[in-house]
Amino acid sequence: MEEEKKSLNFIEQIIEDDLANGLTKDELRFRFPPEPNGYLHVGHTKAICINFGLGEKYNAPVNLRFDDTNPEKEEQEFVDSIMKDVEWLGFKWDKVLYASDYFQQLYDWAVQLIKEGKAYVDEQPSEVITEQRKNPAEPGIESPYRNRPVEESLDLFERMKNGEFESGSMSLRAKIDMTSPNMNMRDPVMYRILNKPHHRTGTAWKIYPMYDWAHGESDYIEQVSHSLCSLEFENHRPLYNWYLDQVYEEGKVKNKQREFARMNVSYMITSKRKLQRLIAENVVSGWDDPRMPTISGMRRKGYTATAIRNFIEKVGVAKRENLIELQLLEFCVREDLNKVAKRVMTVVDPIKLIIENYPEGQEEWLETENNPEQENAGTREIPFSRELYIEREDFKEEANNKFFRLKLGGEVRLKSAYIIKGERVEKDENGEITTIYATYDEKSKSGSGTEESLRKVKGTIHWVSAKHAIPVEVRNYDKLFTVEQPDAEKDVDFLNFINPDSVTTVQGFAEPSLKDVAVGEPLQFQRIGYFTKDQDSTDTNFVFNRTVTLKDSYKPE
C-alpha cells in the first residue's frame, strides 16, 4: 500500500485523503472549464488530461463547462473547436454545460448577498476602484458607496440588470476586507454592466458575472468535488472559498479548489493576445497553422492524440512551474508515429535516374511492407520502371568509402527493388547533373530468394517511378521562434524572434498510393521524416506537412 501511495501525484493524494475522510466515490466529480474566446493550446492539454484522466481513474463524471461570462470575446466557433479538440484527444465528457446556464441563480445569490450586507453597488469608474485597492503593503481605501443602504444597492442592482445604465458606469462589489494583504479580497467586483449580446442568451442580460464569482459557484451548482486550475489562481482560493461559504448548504459537497503548475513549452507562446497578433500580422495563416501551439495546429501538423497524452504523462503533475523542452514533445510524437505511420516513398529533391539495361516500356509492381513495427500492417505494391527519381543527395560522382549511397562505379540497393550500379551522368551547360545513368542486376530483386538478391551492398536508397509518380508539395515546418522563451523579455517585442525559415516548401514526387491517403493520416516518408496530408490538398495538388524529423539525438531523462 505504501508503494502505491508513492506513485500518486499530489492531486491524486488529495483525492485519496478526501475519500479516506468521508467523501464517497459517488461524490467525485471533475470539470474542464475553458473560456470560449480562442482555440485551445498546448497548455490546455495538461488541464484536459488531468481532469479527464482523474475521471477515468476514479470512474467519475467530468463536465465540459464553458465559462462564457464575457460576451465581448466569445463565439460559437470557439465552442465548436474546443469540443472537437477534447474529443480528438480521446476524452468523453458527462455533460456539456455553460456558466450562462446559471446566470439567474448567480443573480439571485448576488441579491441575497446584498440583503445580508455583504455586497454593494459602486458607482465609481474601474480606474478609481483599482487605485483605491492600493498594494499588498498598503491598506486600501474604502469606496464612498461601501456602506450605502441595502435598499439602494438592491434597487440599483435591479436597474443595472434591466439595462438602465451605461456599460462600465456601475459595478456590484463584494464587501470583504479592504485591508487584506490578498488583493483579491479587497472588495472584488462581482458584476459589471456590459450592453453586449451574448452568444447564447442574446440580449436578455445587461450585466455579467466576473470570473471569480461565476466560477466557484458554477462548481458548487454542478457539485464538482475538486476544482483543479493552474497556479496563477492560487491566491484566488481564499475568495473562491469566501464566495462558497456565502451560499453553501449543509449536506452538499463542498467543492475545493486546488492548483497545479502551468505547462510552458520551449519555443512556444500561449498568450491568446499574442497568438491573435501572429494571425493579425499574417505571421501565420490562422489558429490551425501547423506552427501554432494550438491543438488544432498540432493536429494539422500531424501530431497524434496518443503522443500528446504520452507527453503530458511524462511531464507529470507538479506544483512548481518550469520550462518543458519542445524536444520531449517531439520525442513522444516520433515514438508514436514510428509505431503507427505507414512507410511510403517520396523524393523531395528529385533527380532523374535511367536504368539503361532495363527494357524500355516495361513496368512491374513490387511488393513492399507498410510498417515493419506492426505485424498486421501488411504490404502494398509499388510501380517500378526504367526511369526513376532519386534524391539528389543520394548520388555523388566521386566519393570516399564512407559514402554508402550511389556513386559512379558503385552499387546500391533500391529499396524493395534491385541492386543498381552508377555508370555515367549527363550535365547541363552549368555543369549541373540532370540525369544519372545506371545498370541493374536483374536477378537481384528483393525477396526473390536468388543468390544475387541476397548479395550485400552497403547502401539502400528510396526512389519513385517517374512514369507513375505524383507531384507533391512538401511543407517542411520548423520552430516558429528562434529562442526558447520568445516572450521572456517584457521590453522586447516577441515578433523579433520569428524564425524566417519556420516553413520551407519544396516540390517533389511520390509513389501513386499517396493520392488516396486521407487528410491527417500519419506517414513516414522513408529516410526523410514523418508527414501528413494537409487539408489544402485538392484532387490535382497534393500537399504534405512535415510533422517531425525522422531522428533526433534527444533522449528523455
Where are these regions (language model features)?
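N-terminal catalytic cores of NTP/NDP-binding nucleotidyl/phosphoryl-transfer enzymes
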Residues: 6-83, 199-230
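Residue-level signal for inorganic ion chemistry
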Residues: 22, 51, 82, 113, ...
